C-alpha cells in the first residue's frame, strides 16, 4: 500500500511539473501523461495556435530516455519524411529496400503528427500498423518500434467517407481544446518568457525504461470489480438505446478498459472505481454532438448509479410509502368522527357533533393539504353551530381557510366510516382531525428503515472519499457526484423531519 501511495504521489508531482507554464491545459496534460504511461494514442481537436504541439513536446520530459518526433502533414507529405529516407547504399550494393529510421517515427518514443488527416494513404496505412502492432516493416525485417505515445492533432474531424475511420478508431483519447479563456491565465500566457526547450521535470520524477516496462505488466493486474462492470454495461445499454449515439467498437471498449486500469494503478489503487469510469467521456465520443451526448449519459450514470444514489432514493420512496400508509391508518383512527342519528326531514340519516365538543369554533386539520380557492390549505376554522346545522340539515357550510380572511364555501362530506372530510374542486378528499390529534409517532420499524438508509449513504460516501484523489478526472466531475450524494442526504433528512 505504501508503494502504491508513493507512486500516486510521484505521478501527481510529475504531472504538475509538466503542466508548468501551460495555461488551461491541465486536463490535456494529465490525460496525455496517462496515455504515455499506458502506451495509448491521443487525438487533439482544436484551432491552430493553442499549444497542441507544446503538449506533445512536454511529454518527452516525462521519460528519462525518450526520443521525440514531430511532423506537420500536408497533402504532399511522403513516407520518407515520416518513416525515414531509403538507404541508397543498401539499395545499390545489396538490392535491399531499407529505410534509415534514425531520427524518424520508427525510433521515437513520443510522436506528434499535426494535421493528421491531410496525410496520404501510404503514410496512414503504415501508421495504422505501427499503432496496432507497435511494429514497422523495414525491407526484409520487421522491427519493434518504441512508441509510447502518439499525439495526433487537427482542427477538423476526419471526413466520414475518407477512409480514415480505422485510424481514428485507434486514437483512444479524444480531447477538444480551445483558446485560453480566463483573464489571468491569458495575461500569464502573454508575459511568460520560458523556453519550450526547458525541462520542467526534476530527474527524480522522470520515468526510466525499466519502470515503464514493469508498469505495463502491473497495469494488467488491476481488477474490474462486478460493480464496475455493471456501471460500464449500463452505460453501453444507455447508449445503445439512443439513435444518435456514436458507434463504439468492441475494440474501443476493450482499450478503454485498460486506460481505466492505468488510471487506477497510477492513483494508487488495485481496482477500477466509479471515479475512473468518468474517463470514458474522453474515449467514446466521435464528433461535437456525440461529445455532448456522451457527457450527459455519463453524468446520469455517475449521479444515479455510481454510488447507489438512485437505489437509495427508490428505497427511500418505499419507506415513505410505508410511512404514509401507516399515517393514513392512524389518521383514520384519530379522525374527527360524527355520530350517526336517525331519519330527519326526508334524509336517510343525519349526524351530530360529539358531546365532547364544548368550544364555539372548531379548528380542524387536514390529513393532507388541498388546494381550495387557489390556496394551499392545511387547516380550517368552522363555527360550531354552523357545522351542527350542516350535519342536521345539509346545505351550505362555510369556514376560514388556514384560519384567516373571510369565510369561504366548503365542500364537506361524511364518509362511510363517519369521518368528517373535505374535498377540493377535483373531488380529492382529505380527512379532518382535531389539532391535538395531529402528531403521530412512527413505529420503530419505520425509523429503523430511515437509519439503515443513513448508514448505507454514509458507506457510499466513505467509498467515494476512499476513491479519491484521482489525478486524471476533473474536479467538477467529482463535484457532480458529491452534489448527488448530498441531494440523497437532504431527501432522507426531509423525509425524517416531515410531519
Swiss-Prot record:
PANTHER family linked: ATPASE RAVA
Entry binding sites for ADP: 23, 49-54, 196
Protein name per UniProt: Regulatory ATPase RavA
A GO cellular component annotation in the UniProt record: cytoplasm
Activity control summary: ATPase activity is stimulated by ViaA.
Matches recorded under InterPro entries: AAA+_ATPase, ATPase_RavA, ATPase_RavA_C, MoxR, P-loop_NTPase, RavA-like_AAA_lid, RavA_ATPases, RavA_LARA_dom
Family (UniProt): Belongs to the RavA family.
Catalytic activity: ATP + H2O = ADP + phosphate + H(+)
Entry function: Component of the RavA-ViaA chaperone complex, which may act on the membrane to optimize the function of some of the respiratory chains. RavA functions as an ATPase.
Keywords: ATP-binding, Chaperone, Cytoplasm, Hydrolase, Nucleotide-binding
Keyword Phosphoprotein: no
CDD domains per the UniProt record, alphabetical: AAA
Amino acid at each position: 500500500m505504501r508503494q502504491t501511495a508513493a507512486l500516486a504521489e510521484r505521478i501527481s508531482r510529475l504531472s504538475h511539473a509538466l503542466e508548468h507554464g501551460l495555461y488551461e491545459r491541465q486536463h490535456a496534460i494529465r490525460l496525455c501523461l496517462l496515455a504515455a504511461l499506458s502506451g495509448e494514442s491521443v487525438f487533439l481537436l482544436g484551432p491552430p495556435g493553442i499549444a497542441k504541439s507544446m503538449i506533445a513536446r512536454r511529454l518527452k520530459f516525462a521519460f528519462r530516455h525518450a526520443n521525440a518526433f514531430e511532423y506537420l502533414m500536408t497533402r504532399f507529405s511522403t513516407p520518407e519524411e515520416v518513416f525515414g529516407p531509403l538507404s541508397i547504399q543498401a539499395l545499390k550494393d545489396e538490392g535491399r529496400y531499407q529505410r534509415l529510421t534514425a531520427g524518424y517515427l520508427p525510433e521515437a518514443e513520443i510522436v506528434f503528427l499535426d494535421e493528421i488527416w491531410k496525410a496520404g494513404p501510404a503514410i496512414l496505412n503504415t501508421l495504422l500498423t505501427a499503432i496496432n502492432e507497435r511494429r514497422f516493416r523495414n525491407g526484409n525485417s520487421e522491427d519493434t518500434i518504441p512508441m509510447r505515445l502518439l499525439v495526433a492533432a487537427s482542427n477538423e474531424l476526419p471526413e466520414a467517407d475518407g477512409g480514415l475511420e480505422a485510424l481514428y478508431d485507434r486514437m483512444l483519447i479524444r480531447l477538444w481544446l480551445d483558446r485560453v479563456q480566463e483573464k489571468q491565465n491569458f495575461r500569464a500566457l502573454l508575459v511568460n518568457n520560458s523556453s519550450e526547450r526547458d525541462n520542467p521535470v526534476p530527474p527524480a520524477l522522470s520515468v526510466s525504461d525499466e519502470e515503464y516496462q514493469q508498469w505495463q505488466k502491473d497495469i494488467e493486474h488491476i481488477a474490474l470489480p462486478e460493480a464496475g462492470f455493471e456501471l460500464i454495461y449500463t452505460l453501453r445499454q444507455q447508449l445503445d438505446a439512443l439513435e444518435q449515439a456514436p458507434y463504439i467498437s468492441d475494440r474501443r471498449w476493450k482499450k478503454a478498459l485498460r486506460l481505466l486500469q492505468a488510471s487506477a494503478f497510477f492513483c494508487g489503487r488495485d481496482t477500477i472505481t466509479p471515479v475512473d469510469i468518468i474517463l470514458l467521456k474522453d474515449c467514446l465520443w466521435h464528433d461535437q454532438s456525440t461529445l455532448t451526448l456522451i457527457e450527459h449519459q455519463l453524468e446520469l450514470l455517475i449521479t444515479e448509479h455510481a454510488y447507489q444514489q438512485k437505489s437509495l432514493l427508490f428505497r427511500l420512496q418505499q419507506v415513505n410509502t410505508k410511512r404514509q400508509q401507516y399515517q393514513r391508518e392512524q389518521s383514520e383512527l384519530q379522525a374527527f368522527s360524527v355520530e350517526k342519528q336517525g331519519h330527519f326531514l326526508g334524509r336517510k340519516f343525519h349526524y351530530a357533533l360529539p358531546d365532547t365538543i364544548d368550544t364555539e369554533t372548531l379548528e380542524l386539520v387536514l390529513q393532507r393539504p388541498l388546494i381550495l380557492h387557489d390556496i394551499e390549505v392545511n387547516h380550517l376554522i368552522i363555527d360550531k353551530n354552523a357545522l351542527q346545522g350542516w350535519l342536521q340539515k345539509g346545505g351550505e357550510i362555510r369556514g376560514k381557510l388556514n384560519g384567516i380572511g373571510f369565510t369561504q364555501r366548503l365542500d364537506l362530506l361524511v364518509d362511510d366510516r363517519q369521518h368528517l372530510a373535505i374535498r377540493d374542486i377535483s373531488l380529492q378528499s382529505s380527512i379532518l382531525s382535531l389539532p391535538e390529534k395531529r402528531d403521530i409517532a412512527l413505529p420503530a420499524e419505520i425509523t429503523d428503515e430511515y437509519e439503515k438508509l443513513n448508514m448505507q449513504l454514509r458507506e457510499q460516501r466513505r467509498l467515494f472519499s476512499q476513491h479519491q484523489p484521482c489525478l486524471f478526472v476533473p474536479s467538477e466531475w467529482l463535484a457532480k457526484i458529491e452534489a448527488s450524494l448530498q441531494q440523497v442526504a437532504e431527501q432522507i433528512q426531509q423525509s425524517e423531519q416531515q410531519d
